[in-house]
Structures are given as structure tokens and as C-alpha cells.
Amino acid sequence: MDDEKALLFIREEIDSIDSELISLLESRLNLSLQIGKLKKKMDKDLYDEEREAEILKKIDELALIYPKEDLKSIFMEIMKTSLNQQQ
């Protein structure tokens, strides 16, 4: 495989992963919206500092080569969006 074909192949793989990531984020947001409805029904605060800390700690445990602080920033944005959509 020449370099141009290799480049195209790798980019197609990245495009496929990007599509999967978007689908997973959509699924995550849907679940988050369900949680928001339940919390409102139970008269609980939508923001849960403990849960946020758990998620960020999990990043420390799971991230191998992706910079942990960058992943944490991404997840902070994901959680912020989830919270905004719950309101």
C-alpha cells in the first residue's frame, strides 16, 4: 500500500470512529436526560459533585496514551452539556 492509500485508509478509520463517538455521545445524553427527569421527580439537585469526581477519577484509571488532563476537559464539557440539557 502506498503512502497516499495508507493516509486515505487511516482517515476513513478516523471518520468511522468519529461517527461512533457521536452516536455514543447521543446515547449518553439520552441517558442523562432520563436521569434528569428522575432527579426532578425525586426533588434532587441535578448537579452531583460526587458523581462528577467519580467520572474524572475513572479517567485517571482508564486513560493509557490519551493525555488525562485533555480527556478531563472533554468530559467536563460533556457533563456541562448534559447538565444544561437536563434543565
Specify the residue positions occupied by each region the protein language model found.
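Domain-level signature for soluble enzymes in the chorismate/prephenate branch of the shikimate pathway
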Residues: 1-87
